[in-house]
């Protein structure tokens, strides 16, 4: 992303390189128990569980404002892929994902508001078909692939076309091009071939974009908690998803972009400017996609 997913039991994991089951220590897959406990206390005090899922997601996101930005928080082992959560540092993807997963957890009885249950909802969201197989490629690495999978399973609704989005030429290739930056790929180069095939599959599907010149027009139709994917354009004109955050409508009616901002900017989770104005901050940003949480 800028600057540079209800499945099997959580910790029954397979090695990327081997067929035998393996486990990662809980301290590796979950960081920030104190922050989690404070968030649970805020959820109880504010009765967040009574809110619709979108507003609930936005409330969690607001409570995470100020959390420092941290790259590659999901690259936690050389071989084993596992659902994980880090409240001590987030990138743009894990910010929206943790906010949404925590909001979903609040549907359950308070006795189930635990780190283990949050990891369950992260698995449901983050992995193809909602299941982490232990294979690095079971994770949904591209936002457009995440949207396709989560929309298909009824977890979110892709609103992009209904809001006037048009199909654009695009390419998913960031990971094979920059594989040395990814711990799992650097340690398991045999994954590059399957990864390239996965990227080709993602690139073969249509990508719909609401042009940034049209975002001000459709902003009144957006709601707090909508997931906003930022699409950028490369020098050749191909689009790719480059950043992601949440919509937040404040009491004055303004629709803000709430996101984990990279160290070259704020370096933390922030409530940024009005979405339509934010998009003009970067010349390469060409538009957005929109997903609305359903449950």
Model features per residue range: what roles?
Residues 11-19:
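Hydrophobic h-region of N-terminal signal peptides that target proteins for export
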Residues 19-295:
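Cysteine-nucleophile amide-bond enzymes
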Residues 8-11, 249:
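Intrinsically disordered, low-complexity, compositionally biased regions/tails
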Residues 1-8:
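Bacterial N-terminal signal peptides that target proteins for export
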